Regions:
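Conserved alpha-helical scaffold segments that buttress catalytic/binding sites
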Residues: 2-269
């Protein structure tokens, strides 16, 4: 779909924190230039401040505030000790948020369009949610841009850190926060063998959903098995790195999705 200004909102200037003299913060270095025509950065941030998909999945609303909450903390931080930030303060940009409406399918198309624009302007995109249903349109954006830029098939890999598998069936043919990876597999956006469900928990998913994934070759890293392996010397960060390296070797581009449910004390958020 054509992406016009009415579907995008710039970052709230109040979130762009400014430090004292000699104490520069990320809020002073990020570029918020729009449109992204002619922009080339290493990292571009986009937001999807929408939790309609969480509501449709019978979850608690509130994730719509995620992009602003994350930016509020991020832009107070000091820049990394990286020469790139000293030489080029425009090393990363923030393209703002897609503007959600009442139709979740339209919202997803808007998010995909904004993400595609960001991917064309940068080497990597950090997409802030919002409900986890936005993993699907962001993955579609990655596949489309990857195929176009590299004149390739657009083979993507996804490593998702989440206790939930998120392979529920749609209800009333609508996507929601429990459907993203089933939608991506059913829609042939991703080869199921290129999907790693890292940290899935048996007490957070139906047995039928585990079976559905295994029948299709999805790689499941069960949390309890990761913990057992850690006790014999296989650290969880090392297991994560190995899976990521495998996906990089098999794919044109890779997406990492982190759901807050994976954080201690936040299950159900």
């Amino acid at each position: 779909m054509d992406f016009t200004e009415e579907f995008r909102k710039s970052v709230d200037p109040e979130l762009l924190f400014k430090g004292r003299p000699g104490d520069v913060r990320l809020g002073e270095l990020v570029s918020t230039k729009w449109p992204l025509v002619g922009v080339t950065t290493r990292i571009c941030i986009v937001g999807a401040p929408d939790d309609l998909g969480v509501h449709l999945n019978r979850g608690r609303r509130g994730a719509a505030g995620g992009p602003s909450a994350i930016r509020r903390e991020l832009y107070r931080m000091t820049p990394p000790m990286d020469k790139a930030f000293e030489v080029d303060p425009g090393v990363f940009c923030d393209a703002g948020d897609m503007v959600p409406g009442s139709d979740i399918t339209v919202n997803h198309r808007r998010a995909q369009s904004l993400c595609e624009l960001a991917l064309n302007a940068s080497r990597a995109v950090v997409a802030l949610g919002g409900g986890n249903d936005y993993s699907a349109p962001h993955a579609r954006a990655l596949r489309e841009v990857s195929a176009a830029q590299k004149d390739a098939t657009g083979t993507i890999g996804i490593l998702t850190v989440d206790p939930h598998l998120d392979v529920r069936e749609r209800e009333s043919n609508l996507p929601h926060s429990g459907t993203p990876y089933r939608d991506l597999i059913d829609g042939a956006t991703i080869d199921p063998r290129n999907l790693v469900e890292f940290g899935a928990r048996k007490n957070r998913n139906a047995a039928a959903h585990f079976a559905w994934c295994r029948e299709r070759g999805v790689v499941i890293r069960d949390f309890s098995e990761l913990r057992r392996a850690e006790r014999i010397g296989v650290r969880i960060p090392d297991a994560f790195a190995q899976d990521l390296e495998r996906l990089v070797a098999r794919s044109d581009d890779v997406m990492v999705s982190i759901d807050l449910d994976a954080c201690a004390g936040l299950t159900g958020v």
